[in-house]
UniProtKB/Swiss-Prot annotation:
This is Sperm-specific H1/protamine-like protein type 2. SMART domains: H15 (SM00526). The keyword Thylakoid does not apply. Transmembrane segments: none annotated. It is found in: Nucleus; Chromosome. Residues 5-84 form the H15 domain. Residues 90-120 have a biased composition (Basic residues). It comes from Ostrea edulis. Residues 74-126 are annotated as: Disordered. Sperm.
Amino acid sequence: AGGVKKPTTLSMIVAAITAMKNRKGSSVQAIRKYILANNKGINTSHLGSAMKLAFAKGLKSGVLVRLKTSAGASGATGSFRVGKAPASPKKAKKAKSPKKKSSKKSKNKSNNAKAKKSPKKKADSN
């Protein structure tokens, strides 16, 4: 039962905000209405709680930004915009380079060990 993987609630919220193109941000009610209209098979009884969790996760990670006009609001209230995504590719490059260095060192050690063993064998044969 591989089926089609449904998008996450956060990705549906981001898609709704970008599609509405509202300069003053998009309200939670408008986002909910857009998601229900454009995504089939959404469980309406669980959408409210899923949206609350997605808004909290999006605000914490910086994917979503609450507008200054609704700064006093908490939870899934007020207006939201799409924030700037954090730059993660730089971290991936740094993680790859030390692994390459360690593999080079291990190759050199194995070559040195082989070179030391071969003269001993010649000495034994004499």
